[in-house]
């Protein structure tokens, strides 16, 4: 079967933003105008199509990235085209900082992105986080300044903030006409026309008009800036422009596209998705400026099993190449079971194919293939390069795995997932639910790599670990709704770490004689602290065979067993290196086990000698508050051992930046609400680990001893 849409007509893009910038509303309008949904879902009614999980509808925030395929034809005349020529695969990503992992996963498989800003708040902390993630994956993007109907909306302030906060060059291509209640439409700077929405058809049609006299000077000024940015992309166009000739409309669009794809600048337009103004120009701009799969550089992968990970195997959007794709999300569907969302980078795939999971080295059979529309699905038999589809029936595939043709294996991407910073103990209310709870937690962990489930070896309790209170709240809620398990949860615990503060040398001898052959091993080791974030390393400096080679893995195993449970309070040990420099063995009584025990006991002694200390996660907190509450809020943050690093005006409020230990931030939202009569808001994300003050460290050790 041939493909319906040529590859240059595909746009795979994500919609990303800070929480409450109106991202989901934007997606909803796109689905409405492209004819995918017949009525508009509103977030504040809990009816948005993209927010399909029950918790998302209740809380009005997006938790999982829903993938949707829809179609659009760029139009000039105020009506939507009958025969759409472009295929849009849209991923709506969450804006809440606890779900950053979802954004990370979707950016890895997108070609472009639309960043939605709140016209009043501008570039907010999570916008910056997402922007940095997009920079890491080199994703070309454009900006839609949304909520231009809001009090305090300021388009040009947002343009300045994009440049100040992200370092990107912002180039407006469409300027809103009016703001707040006066918002009428926008000026298209490329064609120099007004787009106006007035009808009662929910913004589905619009009219074009010449630019009114009162706006001409401003439009000319911004058009000049846009053209200057565009002609920098081409020497001939630059020469023409310097001679007084402006590029025509098709040339201008081509130059703007070239600069956007090269990440030289970011096109910006404004509007209000909620008021149905400015969404069609945004769709046109997606087609004009964001990349098709053909515009993306080759995806370089490495051969499975190559420890060097030499990326010398190329894959590109070409149906004739060998099949390769990336599983970027696992989702449980109540009707179909487990769905694996997959981006196809090269080749084609048919229902019933047997493919290779190159990351795990296992074969998978494709049971069913679906094109997803939020959570409705359309069964398909064949998929092509550039498609984003859902596969049912895969058994061993998890997030970040590469799927490929068996006869031409490749591993494309290794995604990085952050370590959890918060944990809670969880147990089912009835013993009968234990099995159901374990299965449910395992399913949730397969969907979300930033969520871990472990069993506490001493207490036997099940421990849930995640990225924040909201993250764990929602997972407990999903246990109840999706797996029908009522659970009791403990108070949140901080994920402390242990490390050492100075170099130490330790010698430990393990001897055991109990009739017959005994156990004997002696190790001499040097423990050295490393820079924060460097992790752990081990080296053997044994010369002359004082410890035979076959026993050295036992030594490393003993060291690693202490890493999982440090000597102070049983927390994982990080940022240190160990060198094995000498030792002794016995021909009969030595064994791998004896050296493992010697290394373990030696590590425990050595860590005390090396000044073992507790570390705690420090969160980067930003509070945005009306000015009158600033003093009280700063005082409260300081009392939580917070260090205020700065404050600045943000719109008509003040933004306070601060570093605070996570241990002191539990339940902060309630304190903040009561201090500010509900008007302040905050975001926080993990920043680094710091040593715990001695008096608090003593308390923690006493508690966990």
Curated annotation (Swiss-Prot):
GO cellular component terms, semicolon-separated: cytoplasm
Keyword Protein biosynthesis: yes
The organism's place on the tree of life at top rank: Bacteria
GO molecular function, a single term: GTP binding
Annotated ranges, domain tr-type G: 8-294
Classification via InterPro entries: EF-G-like_DII (IPR053905), EFG_II (IPR041095), EFG_III (IPR009022), EFG_III/V (IPR035647), EFG_IV (IPR047872), EFG_V (IPR035649), EFG_V-like (IPR000640), G_TR_CS (IPR031157)
GO biological processes: ribosome disassembly
Compartment(s): Cytoplasm
Disulfide partners: none
Predominant location: cytoplasm
UniProt entry keywords in alphabetical sequence: Cytoplasm, Elongation factor, GTP-binding, Nucleotide-binding, Protein biosynthesis
UniProt binding sites for GTP: 17-24, 92-96, 146-149
Family: Belongs to the TRAFAC class translation factor GTPase superfamily. Classic translation factor GTPase family. EF-G/EF-2 subfamily.
Function statement: Catalyzes the GTP-dependent ribosomal translocation step during translation elongation. During this step, the ribosome changes from the pre-translocational (PRE) to the post-translocational (POST) state as the newly formed A-site-bound peptidyl-tRNA and P-site-bound deacylated tRNA move to the P and E sites, respectively. Catalyzes the coordinated movement of the two tRNA molecules, the mRNA and conformational changes in the ribosome.
Name of this protein: Elongation factor G
